[in-house]
Curated annotation (Swiss-Prot):
Active site: E8 (proton acceptor), D128 (proton donor)
This protein's pathway: Amino-acid biosynthesis; L-histidine biosynthesis; L-histidine from 5-phospho-alpha-D-ribose 1-diphosphate: step 4/9
Catalytic activity: 1-(5-phospho-beta-D-ribosyl)-5-[(5-phospho-beta-D-ribosylamino)methylideneamino]imidazole-4-carboxamide = 5-[(5-phospho-1-deoxy-D-ribulos-1-ylimino)methylamino]-1-(5-phospho-beta-D-ribosyl)imidazole-4-carboxamide
Name assigned to this protein: 1-(5-phosphoribosyl)-5-[(5-phosphoribosylamino)methylideneamino] imidazole-4-carboxamide isomerase 2
One family name in Pfam for this protein: His_biosynth
A single cellular component GO annotation: cytoplasm
EC number: 5.3.1.16
Source organism superkingdom: Bacteria
Presence of the UniProt keyword Ubl conjugation in the record: no
Record-linked CDD domains: HisA
Enzyme class (EC, first level): isomerase
One GO BP: L-tryptophan biosynthetic process
Sorted UniProt keywords: Amino-acid biosynthesis, Cytoplasm, Histidine biosynthesis, Isomerase
Length: 247
């Protein structure tokens, strides 16, 4: 299981959001470049970067995102506002290791299928779930898709992974989140990355034993220092070794 240390950028600053609320960010007084360098030094294989300004439809973080991709010593999985072919291919050309797509997949599934085939193992599907439906536009619009139907619509598409987020459950309701994510991981042929689940070490241990969970985004816990990246990576690696012994 891959641990993806996660950074969210708003107005050039590192933040975390409560249930995706762009108007009420928690600001972290850290240097983005030093933070990313520390993650690479700790042994991270990937990082996840969300441009919240792009989610809101502005381009204020574009230069910073480009610099992070260029300077990071690990590949970057980039999310936020990927709503056109041009934008997706722009960031692939700029060196993003993977691009995360949600809203565009709901609006133009055929285009997303084409992009995934053109860029194998570089496109990630985002499935954000609220009240039994997939949300789009930065969690502000509800689509007609159930998460199962959304995943089924892309069953044979060569995505690198599917990121699943349970918006419904409160940040502390990890059992409910695990239930939804575990069910969708079982439903999907594509490996699933869990988002919004990890508060501490125990959550990583539990995730590691869920079939078809290939990774976890870890952001708030790292910034709060309720979990160190070194511990997260170690737990994920040792749990994977134990799972392999039983297979």
């Amino acid at each position: 299981m891959i641990i993806y240390p996660t950074m969210e950028l708003q107005n050039g600053r590192c933040v975390t959001l409560e249930r995706g609320r762009l108007d009420a960010p928690m600001l972290w007084h850290v240097d983005p470049f030093e933070t990313v360098s520390g993650w690479a030094s700790a042994g991270a294989e990937w990082m996840h970067l969300t441009d919240l300004d792009a989610v809101a439809g502005t381009s204020g973080n574009a230069e910073l995102v480009e610099q992070i991709i260029r300077k990071a010593e690990i590949p970057v999985q980039l999310a936020g506002g990927m709503r056109s072919r041009e934008r997706i291919e722009h960031w692939i050309d700029k060196g993003a290791g993977r691009i995360v797509i949600g809203t565009l997949a709901a609006r133009d599934p055929e285009l997303v299928k084409e992009l995934a085939k053109r860029h194998p193992d570089q496109i990630v599907l985002s499935v954000d779930v609220w009240q039994g439906h997939v949300m789009t536009d930065g969690w502000r619009s509800q689509s007609a898709y159930t998460p199962e139907a959304f995943i089924d619509a892309f069953a044979d598409v060569p995505f690198a992974a599917i990121v699943v987020t349970d918006i419904d459950s409160d940040v502390e309701e990890v059992e409910a989140k695990l239930g939804l994510i575990s069910g969708l991981a079982a439903h999907s042929r594509t490996p699933v990355i869990a988002s919004g689940v990890v508060r501490g070490a125990d959550d990583i241990s539990r995730l590691a034993y869920v079939p078809n969970i290939a990774g976890a985004l870890v952001g708030r816990a790292l910034f709060r220092k309720s979990l160190s990246l070194e511990d997260a990576l170690s737990i994920a690696a040792s749990a994977h070794e134990r799972v392999a012994q039983f297979q």
